[in-house]
C-alpha cells in the first residue's frame, strides 16, 4: 500500500485526480472504485475539469461506487449515485453500463446486488477424481 501525504486538501485533490487519470491512461480498461463525501467531491470535479481541457479515452473504463445510502431515490442530491454522476461520471462521458452502483431502494438488497454483479456468485466446486 502506498500512502501519500499532502500539505493541503487542494494538493491532495490534485495528486489524487492525477492518479485517477494516470490509471485510465495506463490501463484504458481499468476498474476504479470511488468514494463520496465532502473530501472527495473536489478531486472528482478536478478530474472532469482536466478531461474537458485535455480529453482522453474513457470508453472502456468502469467506475463503481464504494458506498451508498439506502431508502432514498437515486435522484436525491445526497445519494452517492447522484454525487458521483454529477461530480465525475457525466464529465468523463462514462456510459451507464460502465458506472456500477449499489441500489438505493430495494425490497431485497442481497438479490439486487447479485443482479447487478456486486456480489460474486458462488461457482459449484468441481469434483476431481484423483485415482490413477
Describe the residue ranges of each PLM region.
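N-terminal glycine-/serine-/threonine-rich phosphate-binding loop
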Residues: 1-32
Amino acid at each position: 500500500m502506498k500512502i501519500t501525504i499532502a500539505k493541503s486538501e487542494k494538493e491532495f485533490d490534485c495528486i489524487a485526480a492525477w492518479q485517477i487519470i494516470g490509471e485510465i491512461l495506463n490501463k484504458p480498461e481499468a476498474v476504479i472504485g470511488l468514494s463520496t463525501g465532502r473530501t472527495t467531491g473536489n478531486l472528482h470535479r478536478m478530474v472532469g475539469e482536466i478531461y474537458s481541457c485535455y480529453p482522453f479515452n474513457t470508453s472502456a473504463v468502469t467506475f463503481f461506487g464504494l458506498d451508498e445510502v439506502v431508502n432514498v431515490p437515486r435522484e436525491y442530491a445526497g445519494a452517492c449515485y447522484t454525487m458521483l454522476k454529477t461530480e465525475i461520471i457525466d464529465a468523463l462521458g462514462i456510459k451507464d453500463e460502465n458506472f456500477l452502483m449499489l441500489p438505493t431502494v430495494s425490497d431485497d438488497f442481497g438479490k439486487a446486488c447479485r443482479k447487478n454483479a456486486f456480489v460474486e456468485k458462488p461457482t459449484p466446486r468441481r469434483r476431481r477424481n484423483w485415482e490413477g
